[in-house]
């Protein structure tokens, strides 16, 4: 649809503020017609260019000769219409001439073939050596994946041999492992189990903790306990943030205090001629220290 531009309406103003809209007149009618004609030419040119590109890039397209003389005449009319449609464009003059010459040569060969031997039309090559061969041959397009599969393809006999060899090796290895496992089980059954007394376990733990400098309490539960205790002493609007090194220092101090307290409580238990540490020993140790309330 052609669009036509219009000028702004003529307004007649009065003293009371009212206005009358005058006649709306088109601007430059001749120039608008020229623009519309140019737009139509450009649109037609783009369509022809697109159709030509589609025909030129169709690699699998074959030439199919007409079966009867009526079909040949209809094809000639379509070709002439296509060529006449391209006469308006100066860009495709050379392409038009080459296409026209090729089509004329094909038509002449077809006519000569019909006159000479109409029954052998399938065996005649209507396209000459100078024209481009647009026929599709599957041998020209090899599949790289198929080549890779063919390189790595093995016979079923070889694969079965490999499976048998691998399975026999695994079976022999499994038999050897089974014999070793049976020997170990027999040795364990014949050996008497060593029984450790509670004092041996205590001595082992004492040596273990004396040689290490690691913390005895895990860090995450201790940090949770510290935050719960501090929440009881702050207001609702306050919010404290703890550094990791501060919590680590508190944990070191608390563990040192507990170790010293338990040492004193253990001495009090030995003074009472006992080995087992009791609650009253810890309470007495705190009272002697002056920390009992």
Curated annotation (Swiss-Prot):
GO terms for cellular component: chromosome, centromeric region; nucleosome; nucleus. Residues 132-141 have a biased composition (Acidic residues). Keywords: Centromere, Chromosome, DNA-binding, Nucleosome core, Nucleus, Ubl conjugation. GO terms for molecular function: DNA binding; protein heterodimerization activity; structural constituent of chromatin. Pfam families: Histone (PF00125). It is found in: Nucleus; Chromosome, Centromere. Component of centromeric nucleosomes, where DNA is wrapped around a histone octamer core. The octamer contains two molecules each of H2A, H2B, CSE4/CENPA and H4 assembled in one CSE4-H4 heterotetramer and two H2A-H2B heterodimers. Interacts with the inner kinetochore. This is Histone H3-like centromeric protein CSE4. It comes from Monosporozyma servazzii (Yeast). The lineage of its organism: Eukaryota, Fungi, Dikarya, Ascomycota, Saccharomycotina. The gene is CSE4.
């Amino acid at each position: 649809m052609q669009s036509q531009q219009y000028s702004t309406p003529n307004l007649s103003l009065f003293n009371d503020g009212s206005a009358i809209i005058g006649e709306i007149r088109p601007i430059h009618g001749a120039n608008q017609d020229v623009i519309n004609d140019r737009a139509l030419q450009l649109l037609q040119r783009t369509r022809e260019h697109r159709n030509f590109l589609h025909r030129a890039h169709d690699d699998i397209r074959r030439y199919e000769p007409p079966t009867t003389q009526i079909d040949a005449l209809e094809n000639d009319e379509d070709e002439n219409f296509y060529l006449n449609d391209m006469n308006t464009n100066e860009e495709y003059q050379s392409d038009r001439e080459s296409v026209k010459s090729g089509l004329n040569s094909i038509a002449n060969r077809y006519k000569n073939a019909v006159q000479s031997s109409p029954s052998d039309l399938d065996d005649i090559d209507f396209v000459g050596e100078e024209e481009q061969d647009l026929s599709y041959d599957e041998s020209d397009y090899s599949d790289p994946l198929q080549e890779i599969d063919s390189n790595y393809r093995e016979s079923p006999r070889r694969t079965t041999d490999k499976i048998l060899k691998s399975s026999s090796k695994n079976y022999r290895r499994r038999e050897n492992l089974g014999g070793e496992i049976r020997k170990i089980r027999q040795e364990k059954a014949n050996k008497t189990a060593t029984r450790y007394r509670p004092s041996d376990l205590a001595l082992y733990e004492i040596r273990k903790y004396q040689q290490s400098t690691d913390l005895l309490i895990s860090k995450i539960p201790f940090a949770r306990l510290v935050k719960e205790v501090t929440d009881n002493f702050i207001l609702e609007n306050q919010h404290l943030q703890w550094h990791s090194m501060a919590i680590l220092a508190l944990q070191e101090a608390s563990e040192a205090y507990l170790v010293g307290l338990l040492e004193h409580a253990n001495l009090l238990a030995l003074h009472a001629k006992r080995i087992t540490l009791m609650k009253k020993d810890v309470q007495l140790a705190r009272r002697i220290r002056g920390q009992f309330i």
